[in-house]
Amino acid sequence: MSIFLLLTALSLVKSPHLLQQGTPIAAIINSPVSGNQPPNAQSLLEKGLTLYQQEQYSPALQIFQQAYAAFQAQGEKLNQALVLNYLSLTYQQLGQLTDAEKFSTESLQLLQNKSDSQDYLSILAQALNTQGQLQLAKGETEKALSNWQAATATYNKIGDEPGKIGSKINQAQALQTLGLYRRATTTLEEIKLSLDQQPDSLLKVTGLLSLGNTLRVVGDVTQSRQILAQSCEMQAKRSHSENLCNPQTTALVQPTPEQEKLAEILLSLGNTAQAQQNTQEAIEFYQRAASLSQQQTTQLQAQLNQLNLLTQSSATPEIPQQILALVNTLPAKLETLPPSRSSVFARINFAQTLLKLAKSGLLAKSDITSQDNCTAAASLCTAAKIVATGYQQAQNLADVRSQSYALGTLGSLYEHTQQWNQAQTLTQQALKLALGIRARDIAYRWQWQLGRILSATGNPQNNELGAIAAYDQAVKNLKSIRRDLVSVNRDAQFSFRDEVEPVYREYVSLLLPKTGEPSADNLDKARKVIESLQLAELDNFFRQACLDSKPVQIDDIDQQRQTAVIYPVILSDRIATIVSLPNQQKDKSLKLHTVVIPKNTFETTVKELYKKIFAVSAHEFIRTSQQVYDWLIRPIETDLQNSGVKNLVFVLDGTLQSIPISALYDRQKKQYLIQKQYNIAITPGLELLPPQPLAKKQLQALVGGLSEARDEFPALPGVKYELEQIKTIFSTSGNFLDQNFTPQTIEQEIKSFPGGILHLATHGKFSSKVEDTFILTWNTRLNVRDFSSVLKSHENSNQGVIDLLILSACETAAGDNRAALGIAGIAVQSGARSTLATLWSVNDEATAALMIQFYKEIAQNHKKAEALRNAQLYLLSGELNPRFKHPYFWAPFVLVGNWQ
């Protein structure tokens, strides 16, 4: 037996909301080493292992301690080290990381006397794996990677191929956490190659399953689907089952013991299909998994996932029959589960789904105090009763983490029915438990919930102050667990949009009153919270907390103090715009302007604005554009004029990221914003902004692109002319076009590039999903992560910085309201000081004309934002072509990052 045969679930500190980023595959639960150990010690250890696998961690802990004492009395140091390792794993499950670290260290200390025996090396590899798991939990990723590399070498030494594969999967997750995507990808490819070389077997099926799940966790859902499908087909063949792995085909499901593994794979396929937003396929996989499995936990997990997905996708005024059928049958099934952490969380999961139905108006509000009178399954009364039983089970298991979740979930049910006293008491009890075990991933939820309750329970000032304090602590905890939040466990009911983003927005809403003036301190706090939300969005986009942020003042970036930073925030009932102005006293540098408008109305108008940019007549666009101008710019006009600023830097929120701010229209002056005196740039936040301006030196450009049609994308005949003209303005250190425009060539050219401007004229797609954000090369779609890795080769070559990255023919994904997040993603991951990109694909001739004019402006030492503005005004003038006056031609170009 080895690490690999114990699936990831056994290593998870399970929660109904979060899968910790980089959660490694656990050290395997092995039997004691051979020798003359006393039967009592061996039986104790086996009993402890059984309890551990049943998720009864506190009883397992007691038995492991007895087993350790028995082995210690016999002087069995190797078995002592083994049991210490299990104690560490058990303490990790209980969330007691200090004790877990203590026993892990003691286990390794007992293994200091080196040996070449198989037993010694096997236990050493397990101990190294456990130590790496702890180090990752503490954020010591490089140390974790080192230990997993040592574990891999140890498994290799004893010829344990499954163990080697498991520890290499852990390495890949650590590399991903460190942002070393190419190395992570290479490692995962090595794992796949190693598995492919093995004969078909249960071991290979399990290996592919684990690899597929890992790929989903790190965000490669396409590859995850392929690997899981391979695992499924192999196991279907082994168990003589046909058509079960294809959701498009009809399958006859007849459960047999041999098909249990197949059910497990189908469950994972459902999770990956859900991550791909293939709702119907995910439901089909979940249904097959539930029908095929004879294990209660697998059946329930599949049905709960199916119910949650159906609830999310339901838009009917009444509960659909498919949902109602599950809601009516699941409570009885929950009652049959033996007490364990999984059964507690299954109860919580079900209750949270009922709460979602209630919040969407599909369940009537009811008094949930008298739980003995519950009759209907689809009621909050039933939900409360089920969770209360779960809490009792968690108490009996001495599982503090589960107790906290159960109490907090009960609090959320009482919150919904506005039974405020009970809601507050339960939430505070849940928070106390979470803080007691330093479980910040749970604590932030109850701090947020407490903030909502205090905010809703009347007007007393002490409640408002208490709500602000609760939200403040919730945001601080969110920032401290960034790495844990970015990998979503699709087995659980967790969503960034539902359970992270609202914390920031509600906190901003509380800090910025609808009427009256906020204090200077609250205004500054709100600005910082907005910056934190931008960072959290990018973390969620990359599924990695790999971005470094540093507090920065605008005057540190713009020494001439000619820049205003504008933060429009979309709140539920208003647009709050914070403006940071230069040349002001410290307590007066921030100003707030509020426009009362429902969120839905505002966002509908913004989406309409984007659609009208493609209308033949500019007048249709202008009618909507001037409305958005009145909401965003009109209220701050006087402040901008009085401060004498020349640069406007926008930190855009939500749907605003997809529209061209420069094309907002002033109906009074009858001019676009860009026609005023302002240079315009956008940034995902000052804290992510490299402050250095464009280097004052002889500029060089590295240019490349595609002019021919490739991969269903049309030809770009204007690219050749565009690149040729750039050469007449700049010294170019390289030029790669069409067949030469490959990732390998780009990387090779970049390594010797002395720095300056990197100009890539090619198709590309920006999306709110990292896997769908790419630029097109001759032979592949270069994903944003791989593109980042290619650009990192320039940083590693000790050449000058890339001052400006230009992507002149890209576009945002149609129908994706947050697609512009992909632009910000490329901008911050590229390492370039600034990025010039397009919101939509533009006419070839117009693009070439604007880019050539932009380079002419840069050559005259104009700042980047100023150069872009002048180039856009050149097209807008109609001098080259009257058609180009339409904002469709000049407005999509946006400068992200440093504007100087």
What are these regions (language model features)?
Residues 5, 11, 181-183, 189, ...:
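Alpha-helical solenoid repeat scaffolds used for protein-protein interaction
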Residues 42-53, 78-93, 126-133, 137, ...:
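Non-membrane alpha-helical segments in proteins
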Residues 55-58, 91-102, 139, 179:
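Inter-helical turn/loop elements of alpha-helical hairpins
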Residues 284, 334, 551-600, 605-610, ...:
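Catalytic cores of enzymes
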